[in-house]
Each structure stands twice: as structure tokens, then as C-alpha cells.
């Protein structure tokens, strides 16, 4: 994918619909081993937040491409002692070929991208989680004949995953419904971005009614009710979000062949029941595996693997 060579991925809004489809196609080829690519490059991981799937999948993806990985713990770098982001960025660009960053503020990510001359990938911020949604879309594509025109319903907190889902679904030609409690809606600026991408061709619905949002959906999706950094709010959020749990009752309102997704980690008995996450319609483990394949495709495209 020459179009992504040397580029940042800070948001799914950085992609065109064609680039998204080509990225998913490449991920499919790499997953099936129809295509094997190699690149002798170095990936840096700079993660200020805890990570299991993102850290491991990026590391394995880079190793499988023949590259190397350096895990940069911010707590043992000069970043933790107040070194300006722009200084760190201009140093790291001289050692690394690509940098994946997991941090709180989207602006910090943007500053790294502004000052580093190497590609920067958003490995999660409080605003967006683009790599997760690439895996989600690949999973949906694997489960249905055509992704275009399907309806995905997300119930829960209007967080970074909800924000990126709106953008990803709009790019993929999917309808997306976001059901949240009042006051917990997705970021208004991201909503506007997604609406501009959809351009009236697909539905973007925000509602406080999970039943309404779920009726007729082909994909039912949720995430934790309190994201990283919001742990102190968890007890207060529980009664507010309880009606937004994915249960067998809520799932029964979706299409009979609907699938259930969760980006993990899951709090069983809170945002999703044990019966649903372990049930026949759950595709959560397939979804988690696909983090590896889409991120391998992303790295291969950005680094020009051959």
C-alpha cells in the first residue's frame, strides 16, 4: 500500500474509504499467509497506559515482519522528568523507524507526530483507538458476506472506542448507532467528523435507548463503563450504566445472526454477561486475534515492507 508509506495514523479520519478497504484486504492476506512481507525496521512502543493486547500484538507483528521492537517505558525515560515532548520526538526519530504511542491526551500524540519525522501510530488515547477498530472491522468483514450497509450498535460509555467506531463505520459504509446514558455521549467533534465522512449515505444515530439502538443490528458492541484513568468513578457509574449491559435479553433484539464484540478487558456481569461473552454469537476472541493481523498490515504499509 504505497498510499500509506511514511504516514502517521493518529485517527481513522486520516484514512480514505479506499485506503481502509486496502488495509483490511492486506490484513486478510497476511492472516491467511497468502502473502509474506519483510522489513528490517525498528518499532518503538511508548506506552503511558497499561496494555495487554496492543503491546503484545504490535510486538509480535513487528517480529513476524522481521523487524525489532524497543519497549520504551515512560517512567524510566526522561519524559517522566519533564523533558519536552518535542525534544523526545526529535531524538527518537534518529533511532527508530516508527513509533506507536499510547497516552492520555490526543494533543500529546499530535505533538509527537509534528516533531518526529518518522511515522507515529495512535495505540490509544482518551479520544480515539483506531487500531482496535481496524480489528473490529476485519472481524465483521470475516463474519458477513458484505460489510457495507450493515448496522453496528455500540452500548455503554461514549469513550475513545465509540468515537473511533463512528469514524470507522462511516468509512466502511456501515450504519452505526451509539446508545449511552445522558451526559456520556461521544465527543461532539468526532460525531461531526463521522457525519461528514458518511455524507448522508449511512446512518449515525445517537440515543439514550439501548433497546431502540439494538433492534435489527448485525453487530452488538460494548466496552468497560469506566476507562483507564476513570477508576475512581466506577462505583458511581455502575447504576447509571446498568441498563446498558449486553445481556441475552438485549441481544435477542438484534438480528438472529448478529455477532457480539468487546474490545477487552471485559468486566463480566457489568457491561456484558458471562452467558453472552461465552455464547455462540460472541466473536470476542477472533476480534482480539485480529489486532495482530491489522497492525501487521498497518506496519507493513507504513514501512514499505516487501
Swiss-Prot record:
GO terms for molecular function: amino acid binding; ornithine carbamoyltransferase activity. The keyword Cytoplasm applies. GO terms for biological process: arginine biosynthetic process via ornithine; citrulline biosynthetic process; L-arginine biosynthetic process. GO terms for cellular component: cytoplasm. Pfam families: OTCace (PF00185), OTCace_N (PF02729). It catalyses: carbamoyl phosphate + L-ornithine = L-citrulline + phosphate + H(+). InterPro entries: Asp/Orn_carbamoyltranf_P-bd, Asp/Orn_carbamoylTrfase, Asp/Orn_carbamoylTrfase_sf, Asp_carbamoyltransf_Asp/Orn-bd, Orn/put_carbamltrans, OTCase_ArgI. The keyword Amino-acid biosynthesis applies. Pathway: Amino-acid biosynthesis; L-arginine biosynthesis; L-arginine from L-ornithine and carbamoyl phosphate: step 1/3. Belongs to the aspartate/ornithine carbamoyltransferase superfamily. OTCase family. Reversibly catalyzes the transfer of the carbamoyl group from carbamoyl phosphate (CP) to the N(epsilon) atom of ornithine (ORN) to produce L-citrulline. NCBIfam families: orni_carb_tr (TIGR00658), PRK00779.1 (NF001986). This is Ornithine carbamoyltransferase. It comes from Nostoc sp. (strain PCC 7120 / SAG 25.82 / UTEX 2576).
Amino acid at each position: 500500500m504505497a498510499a500509506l508509506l511514511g504516514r502517521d495514523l493518529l485517527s481513522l479520519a486520516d484514512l480514505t474509504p479506499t485506503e481502509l478497504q486496502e488495509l483490511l484486504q492486506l490484513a486478510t492476506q497476511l492472516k491467511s499467509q497468502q502473502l509474506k512481507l519483510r522489513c528490517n525496521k525498528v518499532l518503538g512502543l511508548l506506552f503511558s497506559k497499561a496494555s495487554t493486547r496492543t503491546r503484545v500484538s504490535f510486538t509480535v507483528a513487528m517480529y513476524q515482519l522481521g523487524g525489532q521492537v524497543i519497549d520504551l517505558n515512560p517512567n524510566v525515560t526522561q519524559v517522566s522528568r519533564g523533558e519536552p515532548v518535542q525534544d523526545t520526538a526529535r531524538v527518537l526519530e534518529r533511532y527508530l523507524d516508527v513509533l506507536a504511542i499510547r497516552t492520555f491526551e490526543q494533543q500529546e500524540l499530535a505533538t509527537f507526530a509534528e516533531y518526529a519525522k518518522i511515522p507515529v501510530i495512535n495505540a490509544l488515547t482518551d479520544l480515539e483507538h483506531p487500531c482496535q477498530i481496524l480489528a473490529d472491522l476485519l472481524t465483521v468483514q470475516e463474519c458477513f458476506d458484505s460489510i457495507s450497509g450493515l448496522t453496528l450498535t455500540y452500548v455503554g460509555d461514549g469513550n475513545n472506542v465509540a468515537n473511533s467506531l463512528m469514524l470507522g463505520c462511516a468509512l466502511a459504509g456501515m450504519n452505526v448507532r451509539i446508545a449511552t446514558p445522558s451526559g456520556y455521549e461521544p465527543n461532539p467533534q468526532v460525531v461531526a467528523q463521522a457525519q461528514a465522512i458518511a455524507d448522508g449515505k449511512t446512518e449515525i444515530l445517537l440515543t439514550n435507548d439501548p433497546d431502540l439502538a439494538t433492534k435489527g443490528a448485525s453487530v452488538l458492541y460494548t466496552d468497560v463503563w469506566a476507562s483507564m484513568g476513570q477508576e475512581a468513578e466506577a462505583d458511581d457509574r455502575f447504576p447509571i450504566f446498568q441498563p446498558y449491559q449486553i445481556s441475552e435479553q438485549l441481544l435477542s433484539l438484534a438480528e438472529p445472526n448478529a455477532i457480539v464484540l468487546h474490545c477487552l478487558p471485559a468486566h463480566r456481569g457489568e457491561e456484558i454477561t458471562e452467558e453472552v461473552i461465552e455464547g455462540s454469537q460472541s466473536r470476542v476472541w477472533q476480534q482480539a486475534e485480529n489486532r495482530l493481523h491489522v497492525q501487521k498490515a498497518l506496519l507493513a504499509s507504513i514501512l514499505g515492507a516487501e
